[in-house]
């Protein structure tokens, strides 16, 4: 099985026009290299992919979050299409192994550069759109972004689970909760809990440890958005 076939298997999509796939994975550094005759790279596809991703994510949110107002939908969309989220999706697709770049770019760390992974991911979305149709592209984006969209559904009523799934989706360690303060009488205590995921921290308070943990998780999720 060749490399592109492995990627296509991860995508659940086989390209009819392989040249589009190659263009989506071609780093701009190739244009300055005399060994490469084709001057195409992923920048134009990235431009289109950004627009397609925003359209599809907006449509998904509009249909699935009927009780959310425009402001809340905009916040969720900004999280779903931000550089960090796109980079996580591209990393799960192991795009760094497929990006075609010059030796100089690779030596400079280009294969692990989050910007390159993000750009190639958006270009790949555009390539799928041009090679197929909006419906196929919508289905693939829905699958690749499913865990992040699920997190948004969980945030309000089960923030601890939502935070755990965000950590797993982002390849971080699981959240750690620590009681840092207890105030007041036994029958009316206020608890303060610190939650930490990698370098992200937030505190929450409540009249029980469980409530404080939920509030800390909810606040951290909103901070991450």
From Swiss-Prot:
Cofactor dependence is on: Mg(2+)
Work out whether the entry's keyword set contains Amino-acid biosynthesis. no
Mention one GO molecular function.
rRNA binding
Assembly and partners are described as:
Homodimer.
Q: Which family does it belong to?
A: Belongs to the ribonuclease III family.
Give the function comment from the record: Digests double-stranded RNA. Involved in the processing of primary rRNA transcript to yield the immediate precursors to the large and small rRNAs (23S and 16S). Processes some mRNAs, and tRNAs when they are encoded in the rRNA operon. Processes pre-crRNA and tracrRNA of type II CRISPR loci if present in the organism.
Q: What is this protein called?
A: Ribonuclease 3
Give the species. Rickettsia felis (strain ATCC VR-1525 / URRWXCal2) (Rickettsia azadi)
Print the organism lineage: Bacteria, Pseudomonadati, Pseudomonadota, Alphaproteobacteria, Rickettsiales
